[in-house]
């Protein structure tokens, strides 16, 4: 979106910009992956206690993740997270002379934010469409079963391909 945007002058090749943006996104994903691994580790250590109290592991996972998120530098609120990533991308591209602009930083950041938001909404919409399709199946599929997972993943991949996301 930055390449086609009228308010931004591109000073390096599109593929090099994409590569740098991918690094920023991967770093953010890696931080959350590390957080998830730590939370899983903590819950694994407490497995007997969790079973004894008949606690919901998913709920404990999210509670623990929320508590540790700041320590790992992970922002859990999507809007705040996308805004932070957009700032990181903008700062990097400007500092390394990938782009130039004469408008406000916020205008360019908003282009980046909207692009991230639209991209992520494509995945959410694909997920919703898959759930709707599965609901219409004559044979009722139970979430969590092998049949459900196979059909869900096949339909989800088809939706992502249809939207050009993979």
Model-predicted regions and their roles:
Residues 23-31, 52, 56-117, 123, ...:
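Conserved mixed alpha/beta catalytic, RNA-binding, or beta-rich assembly cores of soluble enzyme
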Residues 37, 41, 45, 62, ...:
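Short, residue-level hotspots on alpha-helical faces of the histone-fold
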Residues 1-58, 62:
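N-terminal interaction modules that seed assembly of large macromolecular complexes
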Residues 124-166:
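Alpha-helical oligomerization segments
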Residues 1, 20, 24, 42-46, ...:
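A general alpha-helix detector
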Residues 7-11, 98-102, 142:
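Charged, low-complexity interaction regions
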């Amino acid at each position: 979106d930055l390449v086609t945007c009228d308010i931004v002058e591109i000073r390096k090749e599109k593929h090099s910009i994409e590569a740098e943006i991918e690094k920023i996104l991967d770093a953010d994903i890696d931080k959350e992956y590390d957080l998830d691994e730590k939370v899983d580790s903590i819950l694994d250590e407490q497995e007997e206690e969790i079973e004894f109290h008949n606690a919901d592991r998913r709920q404990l996972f999210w509670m623990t993740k929320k508590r540790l998120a700041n320590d790992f530098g992970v922002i859990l609120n999507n809007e705040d997270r996308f805004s932070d990533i957009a700032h990181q991308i903008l700062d990097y591209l400007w500092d390394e002379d990938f782009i130039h602009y004469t408008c406000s930083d916020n205008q360019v950041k908003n282009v980046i934010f909207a692009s991230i938001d639209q991209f992520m909404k494509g995945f959410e919409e694909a997920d919703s469409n898959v759930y709707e399709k599965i609901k219409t199946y004559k044979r009722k599929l139970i979430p969590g079963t092998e049949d459900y997972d196979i059909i869900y993943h096949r339909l989800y991949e088809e939706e992502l391909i249809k939207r050009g996301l993979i």
